[in-house]
């Protein structure tokens, strides 16, 4: 669908499936400010769940509910945003990659801090009508990340509170001086409560209540009932859980923070013939950056001079250094090998590949998975419901029985039903899991993508660029009618001289001939026709040109997995050229691993059936669909999806419709490819296909941990409430069980951050074409 606003402005819906739309804008003055205006305007449309504008590629991605709004309403809002005056653009910072002021990983770190402390500031995170925080009421984390337990202020206070509480017990037993005992208990209560009461009161003043509010009420109630020791014990135990949560959160984020070291603070640039050291933030597009052996690249660029082997393991997760030379694109954070490089800067430090990747992840965090939505749906109304239930228990019990007994039980029920462990059950797992995956070159865009990835049962693999490396080479030339190998290649190269098609590149690389044909015309779906030395020459697929006496040889080429093209001059066949895009060396291993894991594997390709079948056999794939156009792939993926959760793996460009049609789109080799990263839900940054089963297994394990955490949290609440109501457990016992549960949930969630790197480079199988 295309909407023309005027002669210059045009909106094109690139993909629209599963409540996710991607719109390409042309003719816009698409800068950072306009991105803010688009996000603000489109975000106000009823039914729009999240929106993100990308100035770099002039595209907008929208998640919306089809039942509430349609494509026309969204496009209309984008058009309206294009006319918003600059002075009327909202004052908040754009979430677009071209206007980032935080560090490369800082925004995702900030997000995880907000998520795990219950403070959400991004759009769609907190509807305006909410009055309840899902998570514990915690203060903002300290600027300096604690690396040891004793560095956490809340744990230091908890320890001091515990010492005072222990001293009160010793004093009561050895020296029954009650003023001293009460003083120690009161001091223990004050120190422990200082970790959560101030923030709870602050949030209460803002009209929000959370678990900290429940604990504050319970502590005050215990004091009112004369149970100072119970109140002090509650404050001590809850302060421990608060401190442990902060420590676990910091520990989880430290893995992400380590990525900051990938980008050096300084870079050497060549200005006016002199090498000058400047801050990385001062680099400009067009600068000539000098990178010496052992140094990291400060930003993205293109090599102008020099050759080396780059270590990109920290970015792509691949351990084998990549050989690069003049004209090759290089990325921020890569480590230079032995050579000295002169690199032309193509992106600023704030807009390099690492910054864009982290930014996109941060922007997509508003998309919660099913487990997080379930936890939120339970936790948000649970807190005020608990307060109402506790008030009813206290009131009814006071009328029918002993008021002191029932008020105390109401306070215990208040604490027993607190959903603190439930609220952190999923976020801590998501942050740990996504952070671990990103360190190995797997970009997972938010909790929703992580959970969906964990439910996938079928995988559709595109052939070109996914199963193969998209680097075809000429592997055989058959001749006839007296033509030579060089003559056949020369005619083919003449027709392909001005083409950038991968097959053309392969043919041109196989010959030294440089003469280009004239009057070259493309015949869609067939081949090329032109004139060379006054004679008519043609190049095309079998069927358009008659293979004649080379039919058997052409069949042999196709059975070997090669694409065969025929060459003809003056209606006389000269020969056949076999061009093969080799399977990735790890393809068969990956397919075998997927099938062992219970995944249904299907190959999709636009190539002919014979070639597709041959390559599929080499890879071990049984289900093959060939001669597909992009829209055919999308339709086929939709059919697979109707049967079971399906992931589509492609390059993210030609496969955009299929990626959008799947439950989950996975882009292969997405490093430096904006469209691939924007289109897919998961991006494999490197070229090693073994990251695919690694990501699937990691997500499946992470989802299991989420389910375990949510199940345990709900079970504990379900068990504790009746025990508290009937007086079987007291306040201290309930708090102890709750905080022990929270420790288990945190520790279990952190396990999602464990992922093993790939073991060495893939083995290269020996493949030859039959003679």
From Swiss-Prot:
It is a multi-pass membrane protein. It catalyses: ATP + H2O = ADP + phosphate + H(+). It comes from the Bacteria. Residues 19-86 form the HMA domain. Its EC number is 7.2.2.-. Residues 122-143 are annotated as: Disordered. CDD domains: P-type_ATPase_HM. The keyword Oxidoreductase does not apply. The keyword DNA-binding does not apply. It is found in: Cell membrane. GO terms for molecular function: ATP binding; ATP hydrolysis activity; ATPase-coupled monoatomic cation transmembrane transporter activity; cadmium ion transmembrane transporter activity; metal ion binding. The chain crosses the membrane at residues 72-92, 163-183, 209-229, 330-350, 387-407, 411-431, 657-677, 716-736. This is Probable cation-transporting ATPase G. The gene is ctpG.
